[in-house]
From Swiss-Prot:
Post-translational modification: Carboxylation is probably crucial for Mg(2+) binding and, consequently, for the gamma-phosphate positioning of ATP.
Enzyme Commission no: 6.3.2.13
Family designation: Belongs to the MurCDEF family. MurE subfamily.
Cofactor section: Mg(2+)
Binding site for ATP: G134, T135, S136, G137, K138, T139, T140
Residue sites binding UDP-N-acetyl-alpha-D-muramoyl-L-alanyl-D-glutamate per the record: L48, T176, T177, S203, R211
Chief localization: cytoplasm
Identification of the protein by name: UDP-N-acetylmuramoyl-L-alanyl-D-glutamate--2,6-diaminopimelate ligase
Gene3D superfamilies linked: Mur ligase, C-terminal domain, Mur-like, catalytic domain, MurE/MurF, N-terminal domain
Length: 520
């Protein structure tokens, strides 16, 4: 029975003396005498959130976008924090007669990962950690790797966008992209649960913002690179460089071994940067791992022959459509091989892999294919629609674009949808603080300017948009609801209402199937 302590922390932490931590990260005592001795207290946890503090914690008071964490130091201390780490601006905001030791560092976030790793006894060194980065395919590849590990008898942990899993059990958590202290605590909890191998998604944000600092990666995997997160990264080059931190020989985050898909130019550049990468290709590139003889498998699945670095052939199959998922599977197989799991050991697990909200089929007995997918950027949308487009059937796509995210991808997504689908229903995604109608207009402009013959309509209400596409579909057609995947809420302004594309699509299908059967 898998259990995880409250707060996704280990239940037993020996602790580290505060003077040793200060020496390790180059912090000094705040106050007029920077050479003052650091009090000899024991730290047993680290957190950024005052409300998460447990007795014995060090509270990291960091500068934020709108406020400074030091404003919450008093609450943290009241909850049992034995020390505070902050910068000069934070020290200036601390109130009261400060009896709790306060460490000063000019860039506290930059040392937080290593500090937390030390407090939790360097958990990644007690585990085999596999990190997967790339624009698309991270979630699918982590699930494939987890399935392969478990098929080989390994006790696996998974950390990613959809959630956290330990030995196949879902662990409730809001930690989609854990900050460094939460990640180190989680890894320590997994080690305590006797997990031996952890596979985790590693986003560009996590790499650039230090969220994986202190983590030692046994293997790093790269899937692909296309436009995304340009609201955070100023250029695609900057985006690439963030991903490269997992592979560059000069990076402190560099994985011990690298697996890189070279089916796009960024992958080939990443392999060259890594220097000694194991390469994979599903597109005929000369690579260590290749896929050939790809053929359909059942409804929506694929089977293919894998050629390994020694030239040995293996049969593999996945219950996931789309040629890009063949590439994801190759990355997974190469990563598994790097940690001692053979294709034959992994194959049964790969064949059973289901990924929440990733090309997830919704079947209510209808006579057409209905899918939900997380594709929310131009490259991913193109890959998904291309995999579904066939001359013998019509294709409908329902999608929108997130507010307060890279606006430059909206028109290209509209153009891509109009090029590849027969019906394009532009709707709301997560508008957040933006005007939903304005977001839709940008998508519609791209679709209109593409000059394609698709029928393009606008239905802002996502529930109604899904029902329109379902009503449109006929026997053998395909309906894809894209953009939100596994998400269970829709955010407008500051309010998030319950909304799950999978639930809504299933309800729409059930409503439609009854009348159709009656007519039949």
């Amino acid at each position: 029975m898998v259990s995880v302590p409250t707060g996704l922390r280990p239940s037993a932490v020996p602790g580290v003396r505060l003077p040793a931590l200060a020496d390790q990260v180059g912090a000094v005592m705040a106050g007029p005498d920077r050479r003052a001795a650091v009090p000899d207290v024991t730290v047993t946890g680290v957190t950024l959130r005052a409300q998460d503090v447990l007795p014995g914690d060090l509270f990291a008071a960091l500068p934020g976008a709108t406020t400074h964490g030091a404003r919450h130091a008093a609450e943290a201390i009241e909850r049992g924090a034995v020390a505070v780490l902050t910068d000069a601006a934070g020290v200036a905001q601390l109130t009261g007669g400060r009896t709790t030791p306060t460490l000063l560092h000019p860039r506290p976030r930059s040392v937080l990962g290593e500090l937390a790793a030390a407090v939790y006894a360097h958990p990644s060194e007690r585990l085999t950690v596999i990190g997967i980065t790339g624009t698309s395919g991270k979630t699918t590849t982590t699930y494939l790797v987890e399935s392969g590990l478990r098929a080989a008898g390994r006790t696996a942990g998974l950390i990613g966008t959809v959630g956290i899993r330990i030995d196949g059990a879902d662990i409730p958590s809001a930690l989609t992209t854990p900050e460094a202290p939460a990640l180190q605590a989680l890894l320590a909890a997994m080690a305590e649960q006797r997990v031996d191998t952890v596979v985790m998604e590693v986003s560009s944000h996590a790499l650039a913002l230090g969220r994986v600092d202190g983590t030692r990666f046994a293997v790093g995997g790269f899937t692909n690179l296309s436009r995304d997160h340009l609201d955070f990264h100023p250029t695609m080059a900057d985006y690439f460089e963030a991903k490269a931190l997992l592979f560059d020989p000069n990076s402190p985050l560099r994985a011990h071994r690298a697996v890189v898909c070279i089916d796009d130019e960024a992958g080939r550049e990443m392999a060259a940067r890594a220097g000694d990468a194991v390469t994979v290709s599903a597109e005929g590139q000369p690579a260590h791992w290749r896929a050939v003889e790809v053929a359909p498998l059942g409804t929506g699945g694929q089977q293919f022959t894998v050629i390994d670095p020694a030239g040995v052939q293996h049969r593999a199959g996945i219950r996931l459509p789309g040629h890009y998922n063949v590439a994801n599977c190759l990355v997974a197989l190469a990563l598994l091989d790097a940690v001692g799991v053979s294709p034959e050991q992994a194959a049964p697990g790969l064949l059973q892999t289901r990924v929440p909200g990733r090309m997830e089929e919704i079947d209510a007995g209808q006579d057409f294919l209905a899918l939900v997918d997380y594709a929310h950027k131009p490259g991913a949308l193109r890959a998904v629609l291309s995999s579904l487009k066939r001359p013998d059937r019509r294709l409908a796509v329902v999608f929108g674009a997130g507010g307060e995210r890279d606006p430059g991808k909206r028109a290209p997504m509209g153009a891509t949808a109009a090029e590849l689908a027969d019906l394009v229903v532009v709707t709301d995604d997560n508008p957040r603080g933006e005007d939903p109608a304005a977001i839709r207009r940008e998508i519609l402009a791209g679709a209109t300017e593409s000059g394609c013959a698709a029928e393009v309509i606008e239905i802002g209400d996502r529930r109604a948009a899904i029902r329109h596409a379902v009503a449109w579909a006929g026997p053998g057609d395909v309906v894809l609801v894209a953009g939100k995947g596994h998400e269970t809420g829709q955010r407008t302004g500051e309010h998030t209402r319950p909304f799950d594309d999978r639930v809504e699509l299933a309800e729409a299908l059930r409503e439609a199937v009854g009348p159709r059967k009656a007519q039949g």
